[in-house]
Design a protein with these regions (language model features):
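Extreme N-terminal starter segment of soluble prokaryotic enzymes
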Residues: 1-5
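Glycine-rich SAM-binding Motif I of class I
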Residues: 12, 16
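A short, Lys/Arg-enriched amphipathic alpha-helix followed by its capping loop at the start of a domain
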Residues: 17-23, 42
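Short beta->alpha hinge that forms the Motif I/post-I loop of the SAM-binding pocket
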Residues: 30-34
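S-adenosyl-L-methionine
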Residues: 38-81
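Class I S-adenosyl-L-methionine
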Residues: 72-75, 79-89, 97-341
Length: 447
């Protein structure tokens, strides 16, 4: 079984895929205490026990080096006892330096310290010198420019040098060849989500050339939201109607895809599905959600109401809100909304100015799963999604339990990583598996 290191591991999406592909993770690291609880708990489920056959380090990558990592690996009980031989080489290092600094959404700051964490990743790689390196990031990483960047060997780069150009050059300077960076679409690999990730693969000089995975699904057979989470609908009548029997994806999620260290399945002794709590929305919020059609976002809803009008006669809480804020009688409000040609003031009261949401389409792949629960409405019920539903859309097994606070807000968001963020920040396990499997195969061919 090839050995891997998982850096910037988060709650463990990449780790799931690495393990499913056949690797044994010897060392993993992340800076956050919330994700540590989730990650270590999951590894214990899989039979990966701290200091015995794996080691998780919570800390800043800027404060550790290759010597520290290799020492922790060498001192694992399975190596000290002689049960297994300490490897001469680490087969692969996987990692995704935090992506906020590379995001296309919002203003980019060239001085954002998160943009330089991939330099620390390179430093550790140069010190450990694994056979293969896999780095993942947001799609925007490929057109990120750096200013005043100095590489791990001291080379200075011109301002506005592109990140992939720097990476390829840096790897070359430390004795690694690279594949052309590639953006992969998660739904091509069995994830019910149109999430794009930039993947960068490097291999040590002299090692067999790896390749990117070929798409496994096409537009005709990609997993839809209904096929992924239809069995998690809370209303039994709706569930029985739209999801009368389990789909293969649902069965795989329930039974689990990630094997234990011995090749077995994770036992779920209490049989209770975790992370299924949903928000207790106020009646007026539910009525507002009910205005959205399948696959419709706030902008499209506004345009539809402006053009066609809308009937809210069966929505008493919205009627009351409009009457009070617009200082109108009920019949006047209903008539104005029904007839179309409605002004912005009325729509702002009906929907609220900050209402930016989308009701996912049940018959399509999900949009990119995000870290906030409020952005998406269920296609089946007038509510937002549970952590478990979001995890399903990311391709996590149902027996993968997310620990810590369910959600958080305000200044705490800078320090805490609640369950929704753990899910939204993760690499989809099935995408990670597809990439890791290609690395596994070239290692097996060599050996």
């Amino acid at each position: 079984m090839p050995y891997a290191i998982d850096l910037f591991c988060g709650a463990g999406g990449m780790s799931e895929g690495i393990t499913q592909a056949g690797f044994h993770i010897l060392f993993s690291s992340d800076i956050n205490a919330d994700v540590e609880k989730t990650y270590v708990n999951r590894h214990e489920q899989l039979g990966l026990i701290q200091n015995v056959n794996t080691y998780f380090h919570r800390g800043d990558i800027r404060e550790i080096d290759g010597k520290f990592i290799l020492e922790k690996i060498k001192n694992l009980k399975m190596f000290i006892s002689g049960e297994r031989k300490v490897p001469d080489d680490i087969d692969a290092i996987f990692g995704g330096p935090p992506c906020q600094g590379f995001s296309r959404a919002g203003k980019r700051d060239p001085n954002d310290p998160r943009n330089l964490l991939f330099k620390e990743y390179l430093r550790v790689i140069n010190q450990i010198r694994p056979k293969y390196v896999i780095m993942e990031n947001v799609e925007g990483f490929n057109d990120t420019k750096f200013y005043g960047y100095i590489g791990v060997t001291g080379k200075e780069y011109d301002d506005e040098s592109l990140a992939p150009v720097i990476l390829r050059n840096e790897f070359s300077l430390i004795g690694y060849n690279t594949l052309e960076p590639k953006v992969l679409l998660a739904s091509d690999y069995g994830v019910p989500q149109n999430r794009k990730r930039a993947i960068f693969i490097a291999y040590r000089e002299g090692e067999k050339v790896p390749r990117y995975p070929e798409p496994m699904f096409n537009e005709d057979n990609k997993i839809t939201v209904l096929e992924a989470i239809g069995d998690l609908i809370k209303d039994e009548n709706i569930r029985n109607k739209v999801n009368p029997q389990l789909t293969q994806y649902q069965k795989d999620s329930i039974n689990g895809r990630t094997p234990t260290i011995n090749g077995g399945v994770v036992r779920n002794d209490n049989q209770l599905l975790q992370n299924i709590e949903t928000s207790n929305h106020l009646p007026i919020i539910k009525e507002r959600f009910s205005l959205y059609r399948d696959g419709e976002d706030s902008a499209a809803l506004r345009k539809r109401i402006e053009k066609e009008g809308i009937d809210i006669s069966l929505k008493p809480h919205l009627i009351k809100e409009c009457c009070e804020k617009l200082n109108m009688e009920k019949d006047e409000v209903l008539n104005i909304l029904k007839n179309g040609n409605i002004n912005k003031e009325i729509i702002d009261v009906l929907l609220t100015k900050k209402n930016i949401r989308t009701r996912l389409s049940k018959d399509k792949c999900s949009l990119t799963v995000v870290t906030l629960p409020d952005d998406y409405i269920s296609p089946f019920e007038d509510r937002t999604f549970s952590v478990r539903e979001m995890a399903r859309l990311q391709s996590f097994d149902d027996n993968f339990v997310f620990l810590g606070k369910r959600t958080t807000g305000g200044p705490r968001r800078k320090l805490e990583v609640p369950q929704y963020s753990q899910v939204g920040n993760a690499v989809p396990p099935l995408l990670a598996r597809a990439v890791a499997k290609e690395i596994y195969l070239v290692i097996e061919e060599t050996e």
